[in-house]
Amino acid sequence: MVFSDQTYSVLVVSSAQKFNDALTQMLPGSDYYPVNFVSNVAAARRELLGRVYDFVIINAPLPDEPGTRFAIDACSKTGTVVLLLIRSEVYDEINAKVASQGVFTLPKPIATQTLQQGLKWMASARERLRKLEQKATTIEEKMEEIRLVNRAKWILIEQLKMTEEEAHHHIEKQAMDRCVSRKELALGLIKTYT
């Protein structure tokens, strides 16, 4: 596997036991864990309510629906990469519908090597999504710090009659003097004065 330090969780939606057996051989536990199999879309939807998967692999069509709508819905979950395997006769039509939604597609029948390449593409896409998620988390944390510092400034302005500039300087200086983050200091000020 390309990203050997990562283990990917996989949900396989397929009613074809022969396909499931072949795919099991391609998903070693060292790279893919857990690997859960369900045979229809209803069970897959229930499974996605319970946990987030890195990969969802759909072997269409399924007994209860074609699988295209589910592929789009599963792809809209943050960080989930979806591969939809579809019959070659309808490949172009379905690919045109789902590719713009971020769903990877491959035509069936499929060679083992092609499927392995698809898994590598999925890993690459998942790692890119993981980096974007980390950036988003960092931005959210920064915004939370700014909100707390601003709230602490307003408390200092109201309680100690400081100007905004004085309150800002006070928070910066106290954080440096105490060797704590501005967020920690702001939380302490908020707790003290409210």
Language-model-detected regions and their locations in the chain:
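Conserved acidic segment of CheY-like receiver
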Residues: 6-18, 23-27, 56
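Conserved phosphotransfer microenvironments
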Residues: 20, 41-44, 54-76, 89-90
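Short hydrophobic/Thr-rich beta-strand motif most characteristic of the beta2 strand and flanking loop
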Residues: 33-40
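Alpha4 helix (beta4-alpha4-beta5 surface) of REC/receiver domains from two-component response regulators
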Residues: 68-69, 88-104
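A short, hydrophobic beta-strand element within the central beta-sheet of small alpha/beta folds
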Residues: 79-89
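C-terminal output helix
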Residues: 110-119
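The C-terminal output helix
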Residues: 120-134
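C-terminal output/effector regions of signal-responsive regulators
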Residues: 137-194
